[in-house]
Amino acid sequence: MDSLYRNAAETPVEAPFVFDSHILAEALKNLYKRKYDPKKEIDPLLFSEVSRILGKAVDEGFGNSDIEDEFIRQLKSSTEVFSAFKTHRMGRDMAAKLLDDKGQLKSYRQFKQDVLPIASHHIDNWLKTEYNTAVRRAHLAADFERYKRNADILPNLRWEPSTSVNKRELHIPFYDRVWAIDDPFWADNFPGSLWNCKCGISPTDDPLTDNSDIITLDVKPHKGLDGNPAVTGQIFSDDHPYHPTDCRHCPFGKVKPLQITNSTKDCHNCGKVRAVIQDAEEKAKQRRKDLMKLHYLKLKDKIKEDFGLDSIVRIPAPKSLCTGKLKLTPESLKLCLKGYAHTPSLDSKYCLLKAIQNPNKLQHRDYKALGEGKDLSNPIDKKNVEKKADRGVTGYNYYLFEYKGKTWVLGFEVINGEYEQPYFVALK
C-alpha cells in the first residue's frame, strides 16, 4: 500500500477524524484472545469504526448537496465493502505478530508493543489517504450529478487542472480540455482516479476541444479508483489490493473453482460479502453499546470521585472559563457521556474528562447567544430554543483543548449567565 499511496500528497494531510483508540484497544484484545479467525473473519468493532469514518468522508464530500439520498446511500454502501476488506487486511497483518520466533504466543504486552506500529500505519497513514480521497471522489460525484441535471444549459465539462503544488504528469494532458457531459470519456477517465488527485471539473458551454490525440494515451486509474463514482456508484473499485484477486481467494466464504467457472468478481454485489457486513454491523451495535456503558460508568465514577455531583465547582484558574464556575450534574454528564449525539466517540468523552481535570488549559474562542444562527421561523428550531431557555440556557462558550495530539472544540452551556456546564465535544 505504501507504493500505491506514496505520491498521494506533497505533505502529510491532517484528516478531520479520530479513530477511537478504545475501539482499537478492544480489537487488539479480541484478536489476542482468538475471539475470531482473522483469516476469514473481521472484528465487528474495528469494521464499524473504519466504516463510520469512510461514511463520514462521503457525507463531507456531499456537504449540503441536494443529491438524492439513494445515491448517497449507494456510495456509502460501497465504502462498507471497502471497509470490510480493509478490516480483514488489518486483522491479518496484526495477527502475524501473535507468535514469537519459536511459534509461541507472545505475552499480551509484547504483542501490543509489536502490533501498534502496524495499526498506526493502517490508520495514521493509509486510512487518512483513503479518507481524503473518498471526500474528493464523493464531492466530484455530487458535482457530476448536479451538472448532468443542468446539461440543457451547460452541456459540456472542462477538466480543471490540479490545485496541487507538485502536479502529477498522468492528468496533465487532460488539463483545460472540454468534452460533452455525456461523452463516454467521463465513464473511464475522471478526476479522483489517482490517490488524493486534486483535479476538478466545471460545466461550460464552450465548444468541445479536439481530443483525438487522447485516444492514444494510456492513462490508467490507480488501483481501487477505477471508474467515475457517479456512474459506478462506487467510491472505491474492487481492484484495490485489499480485495481478493478473484472469488477463489476471497476470505469471506471460499468456494470451489467449479462453482465460479462462469463468475466474474463483483465484491460490491456479492451476497457473501454483504452477509459478513450485516453480521459485523449487528454485533458491533451491541458491542459498542456495552463498551459505551462500561466507559460511561468509569467516567461517571471518576468525575464523581474528583468533583462530586450537584455542586458548583470553582475552577483553579477562573479566567480559563468566562464565568469562572463549572457545574457538573447527573443530567449534564449523562447528556455528554452516555450517548453519541454530543460526544460521538469514547475519545471525545475522555477528552471532556481531561478538560474538566485541567480547565486552565481551555482556550476560549467564541460565545454565541442562545438562538444565534437558528431559524426561529422553523417550528423545530424554535421549540428547541424555547426548551433550552426554560432550563436557563442563555448562550454557549466555545473552547479549544488539546488531547491526544488533536485540537478539540468543547461547547459549554451558559446557565443564567452565572456558570457553565458541559454540552458537547467535537474535533476541530
What residue spans do the PLM features occupy?
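N-terminal leader/targeting and assembly helices and adjacent pre-domain segments
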Residues: 1-119, 206-355, 359-428
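A broad, low-specificity signal for short, low-complexity segments enriched in glycine/proline
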Residues: 55-57, 117-121, 155-165
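N-terminal start-of-chain detector that recognizes signal peptides
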Residues: 66-71, 127-133, 168-174
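Internal glycine-rich, Lys/Arg-flanked active-site/core loops of soluble domains
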Residues: 100, 108-133, 137-153
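Short, charged low-complexity intrinsically disordered segments located at boundaries
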Residues: 125-127, 143-145, 161-168, 200-202, ...
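Conserved short secondary-structure elements within globular domains
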Residues: 134-208
